[in-house]
Regions:
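Iron-sulfur-associated redox domains of electron-transfer enzymes in respiratory
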Residues: 1-182
Length: 182
C-alpha cells in the first residue's frame, strides 16, 4: 500500500453549463486510478461545498457574470496552490460572453420588460440575488491562472493528461489531438 500523500483537488463551476464537469466524468474508469493519487475537496462531483485552505489543485469551469462568481473565484484561488481554467467559458467567457456587445441595461430591459408573453414585468431587486456584472469576464482577468484546458467542453482525455502530468511533476502539455471544440 502506498504511503504517498494524496493531493487535494477541488473543482467548482461559475457561469457555464456544467459541460466541463461532465467531461471530467468522461475520464471513466481512469477516475479510479486518479483516486489512488488524489482526494476531492470542494466539488459538485462530491457535493462538498467548501474548499480547505490547503488545496493542491483547483479546477474552475465557467466565466464571471456576477459578483458572487468573483467572490467564489477569489476565495478558491486563495485556497489553491495551482489553479486550472477548464473550458472556453473560464478561458475567454465562452457563450455567456456573447452578451458583452450589449449594455446590461438593454439586456435586463429585454428579459424582464419587453419579452413576448410578459405582463407587469419588473427587474428583480432582491438582496439575495447576486449583482450582475456589466460584462462576462474570463477568470484570468481577476486572478492568476496557472494552466488552461481549452475546449467546449474539453475532452476527458485532455483533463486526464493535465492531471496526470501534474501528478508526475511534469508541466502539462496538450497535443494537437487533445484540443478541440465539439
Amino acid at each position: 500500500m502506498s504511503t504517498q500523500k494524496k493531493l487535494k483537488v477541488a473543482t467548482t463551476s461559475l457561469a457555464g453549463c456544467f459541460g466541463c464537469h461532465m467531461s471530467f466524468l468522461d475520464i471513466d474508469e481512469r477516475l479510479f486510478t486518479l483516486l489512488d493519487h488524489i482526494e476531492f475537496d470542494r466539488s459538485p462531483l462530491t457535493d462538498i461545498k467548501t474548499c480547505s485552505p490547503d488545496c493542491d489543485i483547483g479546477i474552475i469551469e465557467g466565466g464571471l457574470c456576477n459578483a458572487e462568481n468573483v467572490h467564489v473565484l477569489r476565495e478558491f484561488r486563495k485556497n489553491c496552490k495551482i489553479l486550472i481554467a477548464m473550458g472556453a467559458c473560464a478561458i475567454n467567457g465562452g457563450l455567456p460572453a456573447q452578451r458583452n456587445h450589449l449594455p446590461l441595461t438593454t439586456i435586463l430591459e429585454e428579459v424582464y420588460h419587453t419579452s413576448p408573453g410578459l405582463t407587469n414585468g419588473m427587474i428583480p431587486n432582491d438582496p439575495e440575488l447576486p449583482l450582475p456584472l456589466d460584462q462576462v469576464h474570463p477568470i484570468h482577468e481577476v486572478v492568476k491562472v496557472d494552466y488552461f484546458i481549452p475546449g467546449c467542453p474539453p475532452s476527458g482525455d485532455a483533463i486526464w493528461k493535465v492531471l496526470t502530468d501534474l501528478l508526475a511533476g511534469r508541466e502539462p502539455e496538450l497535443g494537437h489531438g487533445l484540443m478541440h471544440y465539439d
